[in-house]
Design a protein with these regions (language model features):
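Short, conserved helix/loop micro-motifs enriched in His/Cys and acidic residues
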Residues: 9-23, 281-291
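A generic local secondary-structure boundary/capping motif
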Residues: 90-95, 213, 237-239, 256-257, ...
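Extended boundary segments
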Residues: 111-143, 231-274, 344
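Extended, domain-scale alpha-helical bundle/helix-rich regions
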Residues: 3-9, 16, 24-228
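Acidic, low-complexity/disordered segments
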Residues: 187-248, 324-330, 334-345, 562-565, ...
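Short helix/loop capping segments that flank catalytic or ligand/cofactor-binding pockets
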Residues: 47, 69-72, 100-107, 113-119, ...
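Structural signature for extended repeat/solenoid scaffolds and their inter-repeat hinge/linker regions
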Residues: 44, 61-64, 243-535, 540-542
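Intrinsic-disorder/coil detector with helix-boundary
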Residues: 58-59, 68-72, 505-507, 512-580
Length: 580
């Protein structure tokens, strides 16, 4: 900035560190005012250094009186009329005044929220005044231990005129940046070293004006000095304040959509900025206010490159911007189409470097109220305890590919009326222990091709009333060991054509009262009293080897034979299940 204003020769004489600042704005102030304010904040004073044997001069920036040139002596002589050949001081008035006695400066930094951020500085050389005049400065505009220097420099600045002497001399060598040693003053305590802090030269040369006469060339130097055992520093200057929020555009590297640091801060380009390009270096990192911010919880939405944001300033300080909100404009349009979608409240994101989005939408249109959730790819829901879903009317769920449900303990499913379950291909049900199925009235099972039941151990079927089984073609029954059938009343077998019983070793047919074998007009009847009746139109007995018969009495063709008894009546109390 000095070079831009034609100051090509300048030198810094610093004894203390003056670190660079993260962000510093010249706002609403001239270059000179900006440099003076910065110098005051850093405890720096400046003066011009003149060469004694040439016209060269340079600007010196200094932060301690120790770097000033050695002092030169100059006597006190109030009677300048009697002695004009020797440069002296003709007037010298010393004054002391009450100034602030201490400075307390405080600030806050979000990077160290628990840090006290406070520094105290007591003033020096206060023997003549009370020490109760404190200056409290917040914000102190520091972020670390450098704030102690800020407090000390500010204290020196507030007290830069606590002890001051003003004088008059004809010497042109008394100028700011030099030290003088006053001698010969009747007040002995004033004969000491002084630092020159101000100088106002006034000269006259009346004989150089045609038609005028005078007593010759005169030069008066009205100056101000302070004791040289302390460093003069400028008083703190008021910093320009920003009147209100401003709009800016979020910036970042070329091709990047989201550009932030570990704190979620972004960079912006202000609309008034004529110098910085719209890239990753357009501003400092700027914090973003969120709707909710807690320790590991809250709301987080990073402004994206190209979005318009509203920037406010903490305490109106242009060096401390903070983004308070975001706004739409003609190119960045809102979700939906206003005013048609004015009843909708929408939270819609955008896929990073893509065209997709995630969305949560609330529609408050009367009679069409709706909550809409859109997940561009995956959606995960985690519930650490209970979850309850209550649908008053209908619930439809469509899954394009696979569904997996894992229940660690129990699952209870209740259907009030009907349930229809359709499986397009295969269904496999595995029960680790016990399966119980209860049907109140009727169960119908239709299998298109094959039906197989495999039981590893025991299978019991219990039917309270009736059971009917119909096979269209063929039924096969295989029992590995024993097969028992118990019927409480009647058993009827009806075979349309042929029935064949094949027993590998022994077949026993037993009836408690009546055993009968019939075929047309032929009958074989066995009764419980031991009678056997064989009746038919013709009876043929053939024994290839023998036909044996033993009895006490054998009657042939003597009308002694009896007709077999009639078949007992069957009590038909079981319905024919074929009708069902």
């Amino acid at each position: 900035m000095l070079q831009e204003n034609g100051v090509t020769e300048w030198s810094p004489l610093f004894s203390e560190p003056h670190p660079s600042r993260e962000f510093c704005v010249q706002y609403g102030e001239t270059d000179y005012d900006f440099l003076c304010r910065m110098a005051a904040e850093e405890g720096i004073f400046f003066y011009e250094e003149h060469a004694y044997k040439s016209t060269d001069q340079s600007l010196v920036l200094c932060d301690t009186v120790r770097h000033l040139p050695e002092s030169f002596e100059i006597p006190w002589n109030p009677n300048t009329r009697t002695e004009v050949s020797t440069l002296c001081i003709s007037q010298f008035r010393y004054s002391a005044q009450i100034r602030p006695s201490s400075v307390v400066t405080k600030d806050y930094t979000f990077k160290r929220p628990g840090w006290a951020g406070r520094f105290d500085q007591e003033g020096q050389h206060q023997d003549y005044q009370r020490t109760q005049y404190e200056v409290y400065d917040y914000p102190g505009r520091f972020k670390g231990a450098h704030g102690q220097n800020f407090a000390r420099w500010q204290m020196d600045g507030w007290r830069n005129n606590a002890e001051v002497a003003r004088g008059t001399s004809r010497s042109p060598e008394i100028w700011p940046g030099r030290r003088i040693a006053l001698t010969g003053h009747p007040q002995a305590n004033l004969n000491r070293e002084w630092q020159v802090v101000a100088s106002d030269l006034h000269g006259e040369q009346p004989q150089a004006v045609p038609g005028r006469r005078g007593s010759g060339t005169t030069l008066d130097n009205h100056f101000a000095v302070i004791p040289a055992d302390r460093t003069w520093r400028p008083q703190p200057l008021l910093k320009p304040l920003v009147d209100g929020p401003q709009s800016a555009v979020v910036t970042g590297p070329a091709g990047e959509e989201i550009f932030c640091d570990e704190h979620g801060r972004v960079r912006v380009k202000f609309n008034w900025d004529r110098y910085n390009p719209s890239n990753q270096d357009s501003s400092c990192w700027i914090r973003v206010a969120q709707a909710w911010a807690g320790t590991g919880f809250g709301n987080l939405a990073i402004p994206r490159v190209g979005q318009e944001v509203i920037v406010d300033f903490l305490n109106g300080d242009p060096d401390q911007p903070i983004i308070m909100g975001r706004t739409y404009h003609h190119e960045n349009r809102t979700p939906g189409s206003l005013p048609g979608t004015k009843t909708q409240m929408t939270i819609r994101s955008k896929t990073y470097k893509g065209s997709g989005f995630n969305e949560l939408k609330f529609d408050d249109a009367t009679g069409k109220e709706q909550v809409y959730i859109h997940a561009q790819k995956n959606m995960n829901t985690e519930v650490l305890n209970n979850r309850t879903t209550d649908v008053i009317n209908n619930h439809a769920e469509t899954i394009g590919n696979n569904q997996m449900i894992a229940v660690t303990n129990n699952q209870i499913q209740t259907v009030g009326v009907n349930q229809i379950e359709t499986v397009g291909s295969n269904q496999i049900i595995k029960v680790g222990s016990v399966q119980v199925e209860t049907i109140g009235l009727v169960r119908a099972l239709t299998v298109g091709v094959a039906y197989q039941t495999t039981v590893g151990g025991i299978m019991n079927t219990s039917v309270a009333l009736m059971q009917s089984s119909q096979i269209g073609l063929h039924k096969s029954l295989r029992v590995g060991l024993g097969y028992d059938v118990k019927v409480g009343n009647n058993v009827t077998f009806t075979v349309g054509k042929t029935k064949k019983d094949d027993t590998g070793q022994t077949a026993i047919y037993s009836a408690g009262e009546h055993l009968e074998l019939c075929c047309g007009k032929a009958r074989l009847v066995l009764t419980k009293d031991g009678q056997i009746f064989l009746n038919g139109t013709k009876i043929h007995l053939q024994g290839k080897e023998q036909v044996n018969g033993d009895s006490l009495l054998i009657n042939w063709n003597c009308a002694a034979s009896k007709s077999p008894p009639k078949t007992p009546d069957e009590k038909q109390d079981t319905p024919d299940m074929r009708e069902y």
